[in-house]
Amino acid sequence: MTDLHTDVERYLRYLSVERQLSPITLLNYQRQLEAIINFASENGLQSWQQCDAAMVRNFAVRSRHKGLGAASLALRLSALRSFFDWLVSQNELKANPAKGVSAPKAPRHLPKNIDVDDMNRLLDIDINDPLAVRDRAMLEVMYGAGLRLSELVGLDIKHLDLESGEVWVMGKGSKERRLPIGRNAVAWIEHWLDLRDLFGSEDDALFLSKLGKRISARNVQKRFAEWGIKQGLNNHVHPHKLRHSFATHMLESSGDLRGVQELLGHANLSTTQIYTHLDFQHLASVYDAAHPRAKRGK
């Protein structure tokens, strides 16, 4: 194993033990840093002390030529900067060679959401099969509270307060949020809890796979996509779309940007403000369809 690999493994242990990052986040860091290890090795580097800003820029250019998108490249460079900052803190480097290297600005894509009618159709799962009940409960909780996928699969039974209709979730940066989930979600969680022991009860996880283990994020993605097809939705149903839909529908109904920010667990209001653009798109489409002066040729 080279010094390049050794330092990255030390850094990943630091992120896991000291920073307590989630397994999904750790895997993402590992993938990004493996890419720079491969590039550095191809260019004859034996240690990170040999890395300079020119090499980082060449790495960025190579990544773009290989088809890496602007947003993905920004993520890769961010991981690299964080890694080099850590090496500086460990006195392994004198300065961060990636500090002045930035990716081209990524175009900001508006998140896609599911409209209210389609959401009602998606949630209209009335089958007494235990797995269908579990899936309906997961859909209700995700849409009812606007959870991230990692927050949904991380829920334990102890995080529930069904009497008050709330859940506790651990979000990004180990920040805990207490969220209302709505009476429909409560009802379907209770229905699922009546059936949950059929899959085993040793695991603390709220939502179990058919093997009795905590359900995986990949399994949730697969099940949601299948339900989207079964329920006749035209668009692919991804878990994050339910979070986008929650935010959009809440903002359309309340207009309370700060409140939606708190519910979503966004550290910065600017992250939540993207949903105001979605709301404007909705209003603009209504205007174009209904206002006499907006109709072309009239």
UniProtKB/Swiss-Prot annotation:
Superkingdom, natural source: Bacteria
Keyword Methyltransferase set for record: no
Active site (UniProt): R148, K172, H240, R243, H266, Y275
Locations listed in the record: Cytoplasm
GO biological process: cell division; chromosome segregation; DNA transposition
Disulfide cross-links: none
Keywords assigned by UniProt, alphabetized: Cell cycle, Cell division, Chromosome partition, Cytoplasm, DNA integration, DNA recombination, DNA-binding
Residue ranges annotated for the Tyr recombinase domain, each copy included: 109-288
Main location: cytoplasm
UniProt domain Core-binding (CB): residue ranges: 2-88
Function per UniProt: Site-specific tyrosine recombinase, which acts by catalyzing the cutting and rejoining of the recombining DNA molecules. Binds cooperatively to specific DNA consensus sequences that are separated from XerD binding sites by a short central region, forming the heterotetrameric XerC-XerD complex that recombines DNA substrates. The complex is essential to convert dimers of the bacterial chromosome into monomers to permit their segregation at cell division. It also contributes to the segregational stability of plasmids. In the complex XerC specifically exchanges the top DNA strands.
PANTHER family: PHAGE INTEGRASE-RELATED, TYROSINE RECOMBINASE XERC
Matching HAMAP family: Recomb_XerC_XerD
Family the UniProt entry places it in: Belongs to the 'phage' integrase family. XerC subfamily.
SUBUNIT field: Forms a cyclic heterotetrameric complex composed of two molecules of XerC and two molecules of XerD, in which XerC interacts with XerD via its C-terminal region, XerD interacts with XerC via its C-terminal region and so on.
The protein's name: Tyrosine recombinase XerC
Originating species: Shigella flexneri serotype 5b (strain 8401)
